[in-house]
Amino acid sequence: MMSIKLTLCALIFFLLNSLLHHVLGHDNQLNTTSSWLKSHIKAATTTNWGRPKPPMCKPWICKRSGPSEARMRCCRNQCVDVLSDPNHCRFCFKSCRFALSCCDGDCVDTNTDPSNCGQCGNECESGAPCEFGMCGYAAPSSQPGKRHRRHKFHRPRPPPSPDSKLNYDDHDDE
């Protein structure tokens, strides 16, 4: 009995609501967006919520305006240098891990890489290690093949005591 009453109330409400909208001439507004929402949607697409929207990027514009065609790509409507940008290293959206740099499209550790020591393109001399971003830092020696040795510290010996001298003259008499 209760479900019949609820169904009847819902049907009456629906019919009255439809009649009201038809009489007032609001038939079309049931499926439209409010003017407030329209203005906020328009503001969001044009100003990016207060920040200026980046210029539209077409792939051929990036290639013409950048240093070379191989370097510039259109990623998320921005022209980026994919050979040096750590957020777009070689490909759009390929990010380098923390503390790695993008050098010629590869994610490298400039603290240990001898080809990119300290910065991209800084190559260490042959055989010199790259440590802490410096070529040859704490290297054993500047000359290959020779090891740097610390001089051994020798304490000065005390002078011999007069009692400890041997008398060799006494032994010669025999």
Swiss-Prot record:
Residues 1-25 form the signal peptide. Keywords: Developmental protein, Secreted, Signal. GO terms for biological process: cuticle development; embryo development ending in seed dormancy; seed development. Its main location: secreted. The gene is KRS. The keyword Secreted applies. Residues 145-157 have a biased composition (Basic residues). Residues 140-174 are annotated as: Disordered. One of its GO terms (cellular component) is extracellular region. Belongs to the STIG1 family. It is found in: Secreted. This is Stigma-specific STIG1-like protein 4. Endosperm-specific cysteine-rich protein that acts downstream of BHLH95/ZOU to modify the interface between embryo and endosperm and mediate the separation of these two tissues during seed development. Necessary for the biogenesis of the embryo sheath, an extracuticular endosperm-derived structure at the surface of the embryo. Required for the separation of embryo and endosperm, and for normal progression of the embryo through the endosperm tissue. Required for the formation of a normal embryonic cuticle. It comes from Arabidopsis thaliana. Disruption phenotype: Increased embryonic cuticule permeability. Altered cotyledon development. Cup-shaped cotyledons.
